């Protein structure tokens, strides 16, 4: 690789790190830690009764009535092909705002446990690794190395932008 190409790659990586730096709400799924940009988070609620909706993707648990607004609830464990688990004491629903092709919408994301809000600085962020052509990593913003642990930073718009990823609710 020429020194000019190496400099350009390093500059793009630095720009990516700068653009991703900021506050993230971190949460656990199975044994991994993930992070969401805190500006996308509207609230965190305890698991409540979820109304099952027929003929939706397997990872859509159903809908909830949140102060008169019906929102879809997605089990991220199932969306990420992890083993399904019953709700525990620390299970929570993170209500996030997404900008999808159909418009701006609220979605409840079911997670094992909410951890903390972290201020992630540019030096702690690495670009998403490549795993070959067969693995889609477009939903990952990057990887953060914070306090000796790895956090997978998610772009929930990309997680859910696939056609039919979420049911239409009123």
Residues covered by each model-derived region:
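An acidic, low-aromatic, low-complexity terminal/linker signal
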Residues: 1-170
């Amino acid at each position: 690789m020429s020194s000019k190409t190496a400099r350009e790659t390093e500059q793009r990586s630095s720009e990516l790190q700068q653009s991703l730096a900021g506050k993230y709400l971190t949460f656990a799924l199975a044994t991994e830690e993930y992070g969401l940009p805190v500006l996308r988070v509207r609230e965190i609620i305890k698991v409540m009764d979820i109304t099952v909706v027929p003929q939706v993707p397997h990872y859509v648990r159903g809908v909830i009535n949140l102060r008169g607004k019906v929102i879809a609830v997605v089990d991220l464990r199932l969306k990420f092909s992890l083993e399904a688990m019953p709700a525990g004491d620390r299970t929570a629903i993170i209500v996030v705002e997404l900008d999808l092709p159909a418009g701006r919408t609220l979605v409840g994301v079911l997670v094992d446990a909410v951890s903390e809000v972290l201020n992630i600085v540019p030096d702690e962020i690495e670009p998403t690794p490549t795993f070959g052509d067969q693995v889609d990593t477009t939903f990952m913003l990057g990887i953060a190395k914070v306090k000796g642990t790895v956090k997978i930073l998610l772009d929930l718009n990309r997680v859910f932008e696939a056609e039919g990823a979420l049911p239409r609710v009123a």
